[in-house]
Amino acid sequence: MKASRIFLRLSALALCLASAAAPVLADTPLPQLRKQGTTSQLIVDGKPFLLLGGELHNSSASSLDYLNGVWPLLKSAGLNTVIAPVEWDQIEPREGHFDFTVLDGMLQQARENDMRIVLLWFGAWKNSMSSYAPSWVKHDYQRFPRARNRAGEPQDILTPFSNKLLAADKAAFAAVMRHLKDADSQRTVVMVQVENEIGMLPDVRDFGPLADAALKQQVPAPLTAYLKANRSALTPHVRTLWEAQGARSSGSWAEVFGTSVEAEEVFQAWHYATFTNALTAAGKAAYGLPMYVNVALNRPGKKPGEYPSAGPLPHLFDIWKAGAPVVDFIGIDTYFPNYVEWARKFKRPDNPLFVPEANYAGRPDIGANAFFSIGELDAIGYSPFGIDGPKDYSKDTLPGAFRVLKQLSPLILSAQGKGQMRGFKAPVTYEGKVDVRPQTAKLGGYTLEVSFNAPWEKDLKESDVDIRGGLVIQTGENEFIVAGKGIVVVFKDADGKAAVGLDKLTEGSFVDGKWKEGRWLNGDESHQGRHVQMPADGFAIQKVTLYKFR
């Protein structure tokens, strides 16, 4: 009897503890985007989160055995988030029959390795094509028509003009999100990308019968209403096309935008956007995580049809913003040398910067671009592609960059959107020419003159300058944190009424959010008090207090 009573009491206690613990998981807030000043932040577990990620190669997450062997490499790269795809063909091998084995295993492995996930939905389109559609979609081309080129030839691209395709993609995506809602009370998945690099090839638009019929219809009222309401802020490309036809409030596509290939791209972009909007809405209705789209960029000098056309490119932002208002933002995939130029285009009042594919992992400029993106453009996250590609990261710049950015995360997240932080990176042209000239920026009553070489480094190669970058955060009236690699910062009075000196300069690190002071830097290490100089051989942090004198 005594043992029985003890057992009953223990059982009752266990039930009480279980019931008390259950709401904790259930009450863990959903990841969300939240405005702070002039930007938006990703909120995870109720707190701002700086996403330091890496995107897996396309097929790495399709096998749990393969994926399980990748985590040590990912952890050595310094990530806090992995970006990984889930495939329609693997999730729904038979229509209406779903297999979440790989997804569940991915979640479990990420938790075991203390990582968050950004999930990529490889559905109807991945890099323009439809190779991730299930076999039952691929084979049934009458139910799921293909896009056609100008010559009428079918392409291996599902047409966005098919309501049946939209219904099938929505059903699968919503099923994934419903499963996540049930399986991920820990909020391991913090965001979801809807499709991947949508765009039309090899022509500017779909020339199939469904598309041709849509082209003859009136331009939808929500699009013309958006153009009218945002006329002064429209991108020059869209505004020029619209105003060239008289800035009409209604009419056919030809009447409102003309008949050029540029006008055809607008037409195709609208239908991609509205398809994506409906798909995103279905996913959010099932489980309301932040959702975004990404885009492959167009090369200079290429016309629509000569690049993956009609995706959410900067010159088409207005079409996508009007057609896909449920999508939270547009992310940038960039593999061109002119990173600084492209990244600036994606930071807008209505679009926080997120870089899911920041060129290939292992490149020497990855770290410098991360500091620029986060410091200057308030990026919510940064992620090189093919993070599981390098054999090791022992000699790579990424772990050092992410280590410093992790230490600075509380300061960065506090400063975002408030005008308390600047970032620096030497711009590079598309042809690869590095602009080595010093840069100036205003911050907290000071003018910052930033160079990418010390005065005695006269013969630096452009390739050496390209891998240098950093950020500056104001932490007090005359106090700043300078972090990065190879940058030299001279502080001047913004009004020019006083001279500025370095009162105290130290190197150090943040441990559990508290500054741990290292060497006091003076003499040669500050050029006798003239400037703050970050080491050229790795990413570091320095803290400086300034004084003014006359």
Per-segment meaning from a language model:
Residues 452-466, 470-472, 477-550:
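C-terminal beta-sandwich/jelly-roll accessory domains of carbohydrate-active enzymes
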Residues 26-80:
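N-terminal carbohydrate-binding accessory modules
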Residues 278-288, 315-418:
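Catalytic-core region of carbohydrate-active enzymes that cleave or remodel glycosidic bonds
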Residues 27, 371-496:
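Aromatic- and carboxylate-lined catalytic core of secreted/periplasmic carbohydrate-active enzymes
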Residues 46, 82, 110, 176, ...:
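Conserved, mostly hydrophobic/aromatic
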Residues 145-317:
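Polysaccharide-binding and catalytic clefts of secreted carbohydrate-active enzymes
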Residues 53-63, 85-103, 150-171, 183, ...:
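The substrate-binding groove and active-site-proximal loops of carbohydrate-active enzymes
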Residues 66-141, 272-286:
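Aromatic-lined substrate-binding rim segments of carbohydrate-active enzymes
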